[in-house]
Design a protein with these regions (language model features):
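Asp-box/BNR beta-propeller blade signature and adjacent active/binding-site loops
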Residues: 1-359
Length: 359
């Protein structure tokens, strides 16, 4: 079967006002972990907890949803899972109340997670350079570099109260398997060229450089990119990726692994690509419609193949690859009178050949 979908999280079924913020990792051997955030209200600031479901048959069947991170009365959000094959573990980062960041890990394939460690001190080291009031990792999966470094894109805001703007982006990293975390350089701060950069995804390129693919609020409505030799320092000036439309929304990005045969090294990107004639909704953002997958065979310089996964309402997405398939976990439908709030989270499974066939 070249294309299939399954609904993994549902607002009503799972007992939440809103289920959002997908994160997805492929462990190999047909095993997948899908994360989401269950919220008591639709607001980013509502009480919430991180949910997870597990598949052992390439996404055909799934375990019941269970809570993997919670804190009574608090926001618990922005799951960032990392598959670390060398250390045989899954790392997980998340934030609480947009002011603390936690790290935990699983050494049994996601069956259990260690007690979380507060790593907010890593963000405190930014204060001489950036006086943040809001912090968040990811969201979505992140990566282990070939050097063994764990790398997580983060965003911070220095607004008044709970404001998520103005914002900047950076990375944090660990060179000791998650035991300690260090702050990288600030990649880009809010300015007229690239207003309010925020939710960012990372990929390691074939030459060892790290590329960040950046959400932003530019009126050009295009994704932005920046490059670093180590994922933490010497970032290039940000530039626009003209081939990648930006409705102002979180996106997914993954590099297909060495076990994927002729498709090894292909970059896979997912986000809402929009429809002709759409105009901005309230604020600057464009409607989140027509979730589309794109393939690049030249390290993200061009994206010659694309296909729509979900033609109607679809928001945040994350993407994983393994076992000959691409997996995309994404917000779909409308769960309230505001289309930005989805009805649930769906998984699509498909092949590279399916993308190349187009519609």
């Amino acid at each position: 079967m070249q294309f299939m979908t399954v609904d993994l999280f549902d607002n009503e079924r799972d007992g939440f006002t809103s289920v959002r913020i997908p994160a997805l990792v492929a462990l190999g051997g047909g095993k997948l972990l899908a994360f989401a955030v269950g919220r008591t209200q639709v607001s980013d600031w509502s009480e919430s907890k991180i949910l997870m479901r597990r598949s052992e048959d390439m996404g055909l069947t799934w375990s019941p949803a269970r809570v993997v991170a919670e804190m009574a009365g608090s926001v618990v959000d922005n799951p960032v899972p990392i598959v670390d094959k060398e250390r045989a573990c899954i790392h997980l980062l998340y934030q609480t109340d947009y002011k603390r960041c936690f790290y935990t890990k699983s050494t049994d394939g996601g069956e259990t997670f260690a007690p979380p460690a507060d790593i907010t001190a890593t963000f405190e080291q930014y204060r001489p350079r950036y006086s943040w009031t809001v912090i968040a990792p990811g969201p979505g999966h992140s990566i282990v570099l070939r050097s063994g470094r764990l790398l997580v894109p983060v965003w911070m805001a220095a607004g008044i109260g709970k404001a998520h703007r103005p914002s900047c982006i950076a990375t944090i990293y660990s060179d000791d398997g998650g035991a300690t975390w260090q702050p990288g350089e600030i990649v880009h701060d809010n300015d007229d060229f690239l207003p309010n950069p925020s939710e960012t995804v990372a990929v390691e390129l074939s030459d060892g450089r790290v590329m960040l693919n950046i959400r932003n609020e530019s009126s050009r409505y295009r994704r932005a990119v920046a490059y670093s030799p180590d994922g933490a320092t010497r970032w290039t000036p940000v530039e626009f990726a003209d081939a990648l439309y930006e409705p102002i929304c979180c996106a997914g990005l993954v590099r297909m692994g060495p076990d994927e045969g002729a498709d090894a090294g292909v970059l896979v990107f997912t986000n809402p690509a929009g429809k002709p004639g759409e105009v901005p909704r309230s604020g600057k953002g464009m409607p989140r419609t027509n979730l589309t997958v794109r393939l690049s065979y030249d390290e993200g310089r061009t994206w010659p193949f694309s296909r729509s996964i979900e033609p109607e309402l679809a928001g945040y997405s994350d993407v994983a690859a393994g076992d000959g398939f691409i997996y995309c976990l994404y917000e779909h439908g409308a769960g309230s009178d505001k289309p930005i709030h989805p009805r649930g989270i769906r998984l699509a499974r498909f092949t590279v050949d399916w993308v190349k066939e187009r519609e």
